[in-house]
Amino acid sequence: MTQVHPTALVDPKAQLDASVSVGPYTVIGPHVRVGAGTTIGAHCVIEGRTTIGRDNRIFQFSSLGAIPQDKKYAGEPTELVIGDRNVIREFCTFNLGVPGAGGVTTVGNDNWIMAYTHIAHDCHVDNHTTLANNTTLAGHVHLADWVTIGGLTGIHQFVSVGAHAMVGFASAVSQDVPPFMLVDGNPLAVRGFNVVGLRRRDFSAPRLAAVKQMHRLLYRQGKTLEEARAGIAALATEMPEAAADVALMEQFLATSTRGIAR
């Protein structure tokens, strides 16, 4: 049987697995679904069409599924979808999507999301990310797998941060951050590549060498973006062990909509 504190208000239409725990004074709306093993702390509000997966830990005072902070929103049935095994710390706010842009805000699996983080409408946070305290994502931001965002960082609408990239403390991010890169500051500057993070993920020496070379091509040799992209494409045959990493970078550069941080 679901463990619901007697002071919590759970709408009878909400769908909670029998193993879900709900803390004191939490409010859960009628269109909410919560999977097995998830624990919800005290004083949380979970509303809207919000789906939460298995084994998440949601700490006190979090607000999930509130209407988007977008003046165009007019009550349409948009969604928030959260995956499995996420840690969502105190005072986090995740908003529903808006129509015309997919209408769904998503958070994947195994993310570590610290206190006061804001995830706005239509953001897509993939898997294994770390978002430190007071991270603020504006609408339509995409964070790929294994991204790390330092505390007090703001990310502009429609920005993409590529896989394995790290953004340092108190940064202002207004352009796309390529995979593997290490950036920080306001204005934002590329400081190198995320060698410590990649080593922690067991990147081999050849893969690290390829990432280092991609960084050099983009940022250290005075090349235009087109010249750098040509050099990066050639690495797929020169460094076959890193072909997947090269392809990831090529795809990111080809699909960037805000221009890359340089």
Swiss-Prot record:
Keywords from UniProt, A to Z, are: Acyltransferase, Cytoplasm, Lipid A biosynthesis, Lipid biosynthesis, Lipid metabolism, Repeat, Transferase
So what does this thing catalyse? Answer: a (3R)-hydroxyacyl-[ACP] + UDP-N-acetyl-alpha-D-glucosamine = a UDP-3-O-[(3R)-3-hydroxyacyl]-N-acetyl-alpha-D-glucosamine + holo-[ACP]
Name a GO CC annotation attached to this entry.
membrane
Q: Return the InterPro entries for the record.
A: Acetyltransf_C, Acetyltransf_C_sf, Hexapep, Hexapep_transf_CS, Lipid_A_LpxA, Trimer_LpxA-like_sf
Compartment(s):
Cytoplasm
Pathway where it operates: Glycolipid biosynthesis; lipid IV(A) biosynthesis; lipid IV(A) from (3R)-3-hydroxytetradecanoyl-[acyl-carrier-protein] and UDP-N-acetyl-alpha-D-glucosamine: step 1/6
Choose any GO biological process term that the UniProt entry carries and state it. lipid A biosynthetic process
- What EC number(s) is this enzyme filed under? 2.3.1.129
Q: Which GO terms describe its molecular function?
A: acyl-[acyl-carrier-protein]-UDP-N-acetylglucosamine O-acyltransferase activity
Any Pfam family matching the protein: Acetyltransf_11
Specify the domain of life of the species encoding this protein.
Bacteria
The UniProt entry, under SUPFAM superfamilies, shows: Trimeric LpxA-like enzymes
Top EC category: transferase
The UniProt family comment states: Belongs to the transferase hexapeptide repeat family. LpxA subfamily.
What interactions and quaternary structure are annotated?
Homotrimer.
The record's function comment reads:
Involved in the biosynthesis of lipid A, a phosphorylated glycolipid that anchors the lipopolysaccharide to the outer membrane of the cell.
Q: What is this protein called?
A: Acyl-[acyl-carrier-protein]--UDP-N-acetylglucosamine O-acyltransferase
